[in-house]
Amino acid sequence: MMPDIFSSFDPYMFNTLFPLNSLFLVTNTAIILMIQSSFWVLNARTSAFKSPVNDTIFTQLSRTSTTHLKGLSTPLSTIFFMLVMINLMGLIPYMFSTSSHLVFTLSLGFPIWLSLMISTFAHSPKKSTAHFLPDGAPDWLNPFLVLIETTSVFVRPLTLSFRLAANMSAGHIVLSLMGIYCAAAWFSSVSSTALLILTAIGYILFEVAICLIQAYIFCLLLSLYSDDHAH
């Protein structure tokens, strides 16, 4: 029995069900599924648009400057598929939700953001520095705008990672509360139990959509960061 609603985020609570570390189990299961997928076995050009999911992510990447940066499309598409699977696997009862932890989301977003920053400054330091000053700004506002823009750029990996972790955590907390209320109402009122179960089913379907949307937004923002890359 779990002592509180936040116990679902503790990997050590699942040791009785899963002898191995749950983070290791979920992450490596996703990696194995990715390796075995036919997407990575067949020719990339012919298989990239085979499914609506592939079409969605590659269409978004083609709208940004990702197409001009060789080697960036593959990591972003990999992260997208991995996040979709991990988010959906986190909805399975008694399964550890990896994407609800800031350490995991930050380990995905920070390296991509840092690589973009290093690449743009190595390619053209002057153009990269010029991005910190918006065009057409008054001279007396330039120091403040540069400070604000610099701060906004450097907090991007934190806000990106926190957005995914917070949205996934909120959904799991609500599901935990619904489970507690359903268990309490099971022995009191049949009508209340039926209503709670129907509500829980509807919310689970809503969470499935959230899992897909959050994975898409995560990769969408990473691809939009490439628009600031100097060319």
UniProtKB/Swiss-Prot annotation:
Keywords: ATP synthesis, CF(0), Hydrogen ion transport, Ion transport, Membrane, Mitochondrion, Mitochondrion inner membrane, Transmembrane, Transmembrane helix, Transport. CDD domains: ATP-synt_Fo_a_6. It comes from the Eukaryota. It holds the Pfam family ATP-synt_A. Disulfide bonds: none annotated. The chain crosses the membrane at residues 22-42, 76-96, 102-122, 170-190, 193-213. It is found in: Mitochondrion inner membrane. Coiled coil: none annotated. GO terms for cellular component: mitochondrial inner membrane; proton-transporting ATP synthase complex. It is a multi-pass membrane protein. One of its GO terms (molecular function) is proton-transporting ATP synthase activity, rotational mechanism. NCBIfam families: ATP_synt_6_or_A. F-type ATPases have 2 components, CF(1) - the catalytic core - and CF(0) - the membrane proton channel. CF(1) has five subunits: alpha(3), beta(3), gamma(1), delta(1), epsilon(1). CF(0) has three main subunits: a, b and c. PANTHER family: ATP SYNTHASE SUBUNIT A. Mitochondrial membrane ATP synthase (F(1)F(0) ATP synthase or Complex V) produces ATP from ADP in the presence of a proton gradient across the membrane which is generated by electron transport complexes of the respiratory chain. F-type ATPases consist of two structural domains, F(1) - containing the extramembraneous catalytic core and F(0) - containing the membrane proton channel, linked together by a central stalk and a peripheral stalk. During catalysis, ATP synthesis in the catalytic domain of F(1) is coupled via a rotary mechanism of the central stalk subunits to proton translocation. Belongs to the ATPase A chain family. This is ATP synthase subunit a. The lineage of its organism: Eukaryota, Metazoa, Spiralia, Lophotrochozoa, Annelida. The gene is ATP6.
